[in-house]
Swiss-Prot record:
Cofactor binding description: Binds 2 Zn(2+) ions per subunit.
A GO cellular-component term linked to this record: cytoplasm
Protein name: L-threonine 3-dehydrogenase
Site positions per UniProt: Important for catalytic activity for the proton relay mechanism but does not participate directly in the coordination of zinc atom: 148
Protein family per UniProt: Belongs to the zinc-containing alcohol dehydrogenase family.
Alphabetically ordered keywords of this record: Cytoplasm, Metal-binding, NAD, Oxidoreductase, Zinc
Biological processes, Gene Ontology terms: L-threonine catabolic process to glycine
Keyword Metal-binding: yes
Enzyme active site: 40, 43
Residues annotated for NAD(+) binding in this entry: 175, 195, 200, 262-264, 286-287
Pathway the protein takes part in: Amino-acid degradation; L-threonine degradation via oxydo-reductase pathway; glycine from L-threonine: step 1/2
Residues binding Zn(2+) 1: 38, 63-64
């Protein structure tokens, strides 16, 4: 089958023919229809320090997908051939304390599809049935292809109560933009998003934010004053991994504020702990999606009218994957979809 493979320990992705994956008695085989390129895939494509330390070569990459079930393992229940599906890309062990307690997103033995095991940038994907999400008919193929990153956004945006609250989002990548749409949809008052990328800030404006702020030219304190905010932000969602953005958020938070951290800053990032301690900030790390409450909530939000379509900016046939990766890496895009 056709597959996009990290075939060499150097920058790039290569299209190769690989065997159709075998599937076990508790797995399903999925015919891939659409995939989306993630920031993780760009790290692998660029072959940065994280990728070099993490990715076995060769490896079929990718973990964001929509497809249809074509084969079902003999022990699988509740799924059938022909169903429209997406899937959870974190494969958990099922035996650790957190898995047994129903907190699979905290499994210490998690394996990533397209990172530690063959991914979805291929004509077929084998996936444990417990990770497969059957889709309602009113979820489109494009929406289904980006449910994984939408789930990151939902996990972060739903970490704290945002109804009537003022929310600051640092980082206007696709996940940050979708988080902005979520908190607006569920009742936040002011939603401010920051970045230095004007293209992505414009996408955020299309998603209904109160202010999309280029911090190269405008101060957060000035924006807060314009909005009539006298006490700072109630909830912060840090999506960028940028040390300056992280510390700007801490300064902008109200006393007793809540901060969810999804972006991964460099290990040596200094933090002004005085802001955290004397303001009594509550900080929560966010990784992946809650299994499977986040999936339920995000599909329900789409069904209730949440529109995330503006974040999808490019569609390419899979044979144009090199151009698609270059566009995604440029930062001048939202989500980029490959059609198989």
């Amino acid at each position: 089958m056709k597959s996009l493979v990290k075939a060499k320990k150097e920058p790039g992705i290569w299209m190769q023919d690989v065997p159709v994956p075998e599937y076990g008695v508790n797995d399903v085989l999925i015919k891939i229809k659409r995939t989306a390129i993630c920031g993780t895939d760009i790290h692998i494509y660029s072959w940065d320090e994280w990728a070099q330390a993490t990715i076995p070569v060769p490896m079929t990459v990718g973990h964001e997908f929509y497809g249809e079930i074509v084969e079902v393992g003999k022990e699988v229940q509740g799924l059938k051939v022909g169903q429209r599906v997406s899937g959870e890309g974190h494969i958990t062990c099922g035996f650790c304390r957190n898995c047994r307690a129903g907190k699979r997103h905290l499994c210490r033995n998690t394996l990533g599809v397209g990172v530690n095991r063959p991914g979805c940038f291929a004509e077929y994907l084998a996936l444990p049935a417990t990770n497969v999400i059957a889709l309602p008919d009113n979820i489109t193929e494009e929406q289904a292809a980006i449910l994984d990153p939408f789930g990151n956004a939902a996990h972060c945006a739903l970490a704290f109560d945002v109804v009537g609250e003022d929310v600051l989002i640092t980082g206007a990548g696709p996940i940050g933009i979708m988080a902005a749409a979520i908190v607006r949809h569920i009742g936040a008052r002011h939603v401010v998003i920051t970045d230095v990328n004007d293209h992505r800030l414009e996408l955020a404006r299309q998603m209904g934010v109160s202010r999309a702020v280029n911090v190269k030219y405008q101060k957060l304190s000035d924006v807060a004053n314009e909005l009539g905010m006298l006490e700072g932000f109630d909830v912060g969602l840090e999506m960028s991994g940028n040390p300056m953005a992280l510390n700007d958020m801490m300064k902008a938070m109200n006393h007793g504020g809540h901060v969810a951290l999804l972006g991964i800053p460099p290990q040596e990032t200094p933090i002004d702990w005085n802001q955290v301690i004397f303001k009594g900030l509550v900080i929560k790390g966010i990784y992946g999606r809650e299994m499977f409450e986040t999936w339920y909530k995000m599909i329900a939000m789409l069904q209730s009218g949440l529109n995330i379509s503006p974040v999808i900016t490019h569609n390419f046939p899979v044979d144009e994957y090199q151009h698609a990766f270059q566009i995604m890496a440029s930062g001048q895009s939202g989500k980029v979809i490959l059609n198989w």
